[in-house]
């Protein structure tokens, strides 16, 4: 907007004064007399984190990340952005700060991680894979040819790489390349009744059942307020690739991918390990809660896990996690919700691939590319696995993320 002249130098000066971020009169004069352009000034201040996305309230400015223990469902990290400083609200509440929190356009009091229902995009294809395998519509060795346009329904959806084709794919390679056509076929086959007629509602009921079994279509279980997840109620063919009316918060996505990483063991998520009294005596120990077990054969789970591993090796996220030593399995997803705003992006997965320890979900609204949640998770996991330190993160320059993911 600055570069295109939609915002004047005076708008920029007003912005930084309002936010209290204009460091000196010298900078003020440089902006006024043109010694530094507003565009270069804003870019410099964003890279130094003097001005943050939340301050601008321009897309993308909100997102969330959740990391869980695959073997227990315990939440290891839950981050929402924009956020606020708890210290300013502890004991004595700073009234000016409280007023600002309630009136800021970026809504820092809104918990994006637990309440922002966001379309999942192609991350939903893991659910469709499980449903298709469990109900015997496909098996790990079923190959479907990507005919690009799915003409069994009108209007006909297409594979995102149209006019190109993924060719013959099975569940593993369909996940690797995020082949829409493969999942269109499953969403359609689930809806065929005994007479061979397509009934979308029949398929949607199956998809909803497995979304709930996987922990996606039910609340996560965290001990704070969360929104009710929404599984799509329209068009099973498009729902099968994550479109339709699907809407999930990051904690819902985290429980879902934790279940996949745990080969079907659906743990309720929890933020609490134990409760102690003032003398450090444990008065409550919160044990893992298993809600259900999704029944697939070992070969079927292996096929899904292989597909997720291929995503980060040769698929839609192949160029991104190269700086991470730990082996990653995951799935990318982008989703359009508003024609006038950028797409949402998500990445879900687990690590290490060989023996899952943690699973994770990151969703950034209106950021357009899965490279952004991917980069966020890459750096977070490098820290978790001890490959970089806190100081490394804090001292690193803020640069553009390396875009390597496809939008699908």
Language-model features, listed with the residues they occupy:
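Beta-lactam-recognizing serine transpeptidase/beta-lactamase-like catalytic domain environment
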Residues: 1-42, 46, 53-365, 407-408
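Short, charged, low-complexity patches
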Residues: 253, 369-378
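Short, gly/Ser/Thr-rich active-site loops of penicillin-recognizing serine hydrolases
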Residues: 281-283, 289, 376-408
């Amino acid at each position: 907007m600055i570069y295109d002249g939609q915002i004047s130098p005076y708008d920029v000066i007003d912005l930084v004064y309002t936010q209290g971020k204009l460091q000196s009169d010298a900078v003020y004069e440089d902006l006024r007399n043109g010694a530094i352009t507003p565009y270069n000034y804003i870019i410099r201040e964003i890279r130094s984190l003097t001005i943050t996305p939340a301050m601008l309230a321009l897309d993308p400015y909100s997102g969330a990340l959740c990391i869980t223990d695959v073997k227990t469902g315990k939440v290891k990290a839950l981050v929402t952005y924009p956020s606020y400083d708890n210290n300013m609200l502890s004991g004595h509440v700073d009234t000016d700060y409280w007023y600002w929190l309630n009136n800021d356009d970026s809504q820092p009091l809104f918990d994006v991680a637990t309440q922002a229902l966001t379309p999942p995009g192609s991350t939903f294809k893991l659910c469709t894979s499980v449903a298709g395998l469990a109900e015997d519509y496909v098996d790990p060795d079923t190959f479907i040819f990507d005919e690009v346009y799915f003409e069994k329904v009108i209007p006909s959806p297409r594979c995102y790489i149209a006019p190109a084709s993924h060719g013959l794919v099975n569940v593993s390679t369909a996940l690797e390349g995020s082949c829409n056509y493969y999942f269109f076929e499953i969403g359609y086959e689930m809806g065929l009744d005994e007479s061979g007629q397509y009934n979308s509602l029949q398929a949607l009921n199956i998809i909803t059942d497995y979304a709930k079994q996987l922990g996606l279509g039910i609340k996560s279980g965290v001990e704070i307020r969360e929104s009710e997840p929404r599984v799509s109620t329209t068009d099973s063919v498009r729902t099968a690739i994550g479109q339709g009316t699907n809407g999930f918060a990051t904690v819902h996505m985290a429980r879902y991918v934790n279940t996949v990483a745990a080969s079907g063991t659906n743990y309720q998520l929890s933020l609490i390990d134990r409760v102690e009294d003032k003398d450090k005596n444990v008065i409550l120990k919160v044990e893992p809660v298993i809600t259900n077990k999704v029944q697939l054969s070992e070969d079927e789970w292996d096929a899904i896990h292989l597909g997720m591993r291929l995503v980060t090796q040769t698929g839609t996220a192949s160029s991104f996690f190269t700086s991470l030593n730990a082996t990653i399995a995951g799935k990318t997803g982008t989703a359009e919700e508003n024609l006038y705003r950028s797409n949402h992006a998500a990445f879900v997965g687990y690590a290490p691939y060989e023996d899952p320890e943690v699973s994770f979900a990151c969703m950034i609204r209106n950021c357009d590319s899965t490279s952004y949640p991917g980069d966020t998770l890459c750096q977070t996991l490098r820290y978790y696995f001890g490959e970089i330190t806190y100081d490394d993160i804090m001292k690193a320059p803020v640069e553009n993320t390396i875009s390597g993911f496809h939008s699908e």
